[in-house]
């Protein structure tokens, strides 16, 4: 993507979801948001995407939108996953929003002994519904074209052994790691994890759960994609410097 195209994408009024990027049609809710909330005017430009990597520019018309560019297919992102224990208040929602912005591809809610949030039945469904809504909003704001996957909840005992566990005071290499588990307020319960599970530290300070999730996501995405030093016009791309 050229710098000019990138700036055009960023400066578009908004990004909206459509079923078919080639022939973009907004649903009732998105049409209301575009014309009544954002008060889009004829001729203004937006980005449309299907959440599967395809996107295009579109122009606002009289109660509709019209595609004005070729359909672009973005490359699939480097697979990264965060296992996060639901946190009190809106902390989990903040984490979900930032993980979407950072480019994490998958989030799995984690059931831990020390979790302090009701996460069963109707409570669980409401929480996951909010996560999905926030993820969609964040994707539009950051111009992300691939939806993040929000999986069903799993217990600590069911987490694959190749998932690294974030634990203060430990050290471990991120080499080959694509998934990290972040604990609840108060930390993991003694003996909650198998001795076989890799432990990694996230710095010398004790982080809040939502901060730990953001730090872990940054490390994973940095290692996988090297977006810390990225060019649009042929400059050197530095990748994989975190060992």
How should these model regions be labeled?
Residues 1-73, 235, 241-242:
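N-terminal positively charged helical leader segments and presequences
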Residues 3, 73-162:
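RNA substrate-binding interface of SAM-dependent RNA methyltransferases
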Residues 70-72, 170-171, 185-187, 204-208:
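Short, acidic/turn-prone active-site loops that include or flank metal/cofactor-
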Residues 83, 165-167, 179-182:
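Structural motif
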Residues 190-243:
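Structured adenosyl-cofactor binding patch, chiefly the S-adenosyl-L-methionine
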């Amino acid at each position: 993507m050229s710098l000019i195209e990138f700036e055009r994408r960023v400066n578009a009024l908004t990004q909206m979801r459509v079923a078919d990027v080639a022939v973009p049609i907004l649903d009732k809710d998105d049409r209301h948001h575009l014309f009544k909330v954002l008060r889009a005017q004829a001729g203004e430009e937006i980005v449309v995407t299907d959440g599967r990597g395809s996107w295009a520019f579109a122009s606002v018309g009289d109660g509709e939108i019209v595609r004005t560019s070729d359909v672009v297919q973005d490359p699939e992102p480097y697979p990264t996953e965060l296992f996060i224990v639901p946190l009190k208040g809106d902390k989990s929602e903040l984490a979900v929003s930032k993980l979407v912005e950072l480019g994490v591809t998958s989030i799995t809610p984690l059931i831990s002994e020390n979790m302090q949030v009701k996460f069963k039945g109707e409570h669980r469904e409401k929480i996951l519904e909010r996560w999905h809504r926030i993820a969609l909003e964040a994707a539009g704001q950051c111009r992300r074209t691939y939806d993040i996957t929000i999986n069903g909840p799993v217990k600590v005992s069911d987490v694959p052994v190749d998932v690294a566990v974030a634990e203060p005071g430990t050290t471990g290499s991120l080499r080959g790691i694509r998934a990290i588990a972040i604990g609840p307020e108060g930390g993991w319960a003694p003996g909650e994890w198998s001795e076989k599970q890799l432990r990694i530290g996230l710095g010398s300070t004790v982080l809040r759960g939502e901060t730990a999730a953001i730090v872990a996501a940054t490390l994973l995405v940095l290692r996988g994609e090297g977006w810390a030093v990225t060019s649009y016009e042929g400059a050197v791309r530095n990748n994989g410097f975190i060992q």
